[in-house]
Amino acid sequence: MSSVVVVGTQWGDEGKGKITDFLSENAEAIARYQGGNNAGHTIKFDGVTYKLHLIPSGIFYKEKISVIGNGMVVDPKALVEELKYLHDKGVDTSNLRISNRAHIILPYHIRIDEADEERKGANKIGTTKKGIGPAYMDKAARVGIRIIDLLDKETFKEKLEHNLGEKNRLLERFYELEGFKLEDILDEYYEYGQQFKEYVCDTSVVLNDALDDGKRVLFEGAQGVMLDIDQGTYPFVTSSNPIAGGVTIGSGVGPSKINHVVGVAKAYTTRVGDGPFPTELFDSIGDTIREVGHEYGTTTGRPRRVGWFDSVVVRHARRVSGLTDLSLTLLDVLTGIETLKICVAYKLDGKTITEFPASLKDLARCEPVYEELPGWTEDITGVTSLDDLPVNCRHYMERIAQLTGVQVSMFSVGPDRAQTHVIKSVWRLA
């Protein structure tokens, strides 16, 4: 039995899809355990670029099981569209399994999400307006509708009718927006469910059976540790738990069956949406990194905010996710920058702190303490091993490992699969 969890160590968009796709080659099952179609991942497979939002990266390997876990919230319409997108490109999706316990996103969740973000004005969270938060709210309030409910029209109608009474009052009286009629949703969404019912099952059984049979299972996180609802920059976070601990809740696999946790980190830092970002750059270097790194959101198309690598953030990720390995991505983007900076600590009211503060007021007053390292000018996109990297690039990686306390086991120097390199296998048994 061998299992690996892939988590983002920053604010998402670290390149988890690429690393998951790379590690999928040696996995026999790949599972997502939280989030929804608010997170996009870009995968290049057999020379073709795919952009997915719901379906796990493992879908391209027809001999491997690809799982949408119970901890996810699934927009049935978006799922049907994504399946069609893959089918139109000739991708076989018969290896997909969808948890019957996953909750669904309905049109009222999306409308409430949009209305609430608009109402907040300057205090907005910066959500993708995909209905994720409201769907998780319903789940916590025990009024959510699960995929198993969607597949039974009588049950779906009963629950939908009950929820529409409450949601329409909220939309009409509080937000002053038009509500929904039962017939607006019932038949359309029931039909979506019928289109993917062949994939629906108890995925906890599927995953545990795979592990018990000695198979390799890969768990794919969405977003990142700093967007975790408990451990992130609350309230500027997502509504689920991207940290490694979310795996056990969102997949139905116990913690004793998790072997390694790979934290994916960019060689710099980015963020989409509002919220604190201590190392954010507002100068020409930030603009250069954004353009060279194509830093625009997969889901929203919004320009990402860009900053220097923050070891305080990644140390926090190491602690709360129990990272065993680090995968450093987009090293090539830093090529040509004369002097690189790594944030090693923060200054808060004149005092040096090395741990990430919980208070946003404190965080707003934090000033990054930087360590400068010489950059490199050599093109590294064609390297095939660690030894091929320029000395300054290797020193940069070594310093990140020292500051974060996590060994760098993988690094990537470009978007293609061949540009990802392994220093130490994360599939090791010890």
From Swiss-Prot:
Gene3D superfamilies assigned: Adenylosuccinate Synthetase, subunit A, domain 1, Adenylosuccinate Synthetase, subunit A, domain 2, Adenylosuccinate Synthetase, subunit A, domain 3
GO biological process: 'de novo' AMP biosynthetic process; IMP metabolic process
Keyword entries, A-Z: Cytoplasm, GTP-binding, Ligase, Magnesium, Metal-binding, Nucleotide-binding, Purine biosynthesis
Single GO MF descriptor: GTP binding
List of residues binding substrate: 298-304
Binding annotation for Mg(2+): 13, 40
SUPFAM superfamilies: P-loop containing nucleoside triphosphate hydrolases
Residues reported to bind GTP: 12-18, 40-42, 304, 330-332, 412-414
Cellular component per GO, a single term: cytoplasm
UniProt pathway: Purine metabolism; AMP biosynthesis via de novo pathway; AMP from IMP: step 1/2
Active site, UniProt feature: 13 (proton acceptor), 41 (proton donor)
InterPro entries: Adenylosuccin_syn_GTP-bd (IPR018220), Adenylosuccin_syn_Lys_AS (IPR033128), Adenylosuccinate_synth_dom1 (IPR042109), Adenylosuccinate_synth_dom2 (IPR042110), Adenylosuccinate_synth_dom3 (IPR042111), Adenylosuccinate_synthetase (IPR001114), P-loop_NTPase (IPR027417)
Cofactor note: Binds 1 Mg(2+) ion per subunit.
Pfam families: Adenylsucc_synt
Domain of life: Bacteria
Cofactor(s) of this protein: Mg(2+)
EC number: 6.3.4.4
Keyword Acetylation assigned: no
The reaction(s) this protein catalyses: IMP + L-aspartate + GTP = N(6)-(1,2-dicarboxyethyl)-AMP + GDP + phosphate + 2 H(+)
PROSITE patterns listed in its UniProt record: ADENYLOSUCCIN_SYN_1, ADENYLOSUCCIN_SYN_2
Broad EC category: ligase
Purpose: Plays an important role in the de novo pathway of purine nucleotide biosynthesis. Catalyzes the first committed step in the biosynthesis of AMP from IMP.
Assembly with partners or alone: Homodimer.
Family, as annotated: Belongs to the adenylosuccinate synthetase family.
Protein name per the record: Adenylosuccinate synthetase
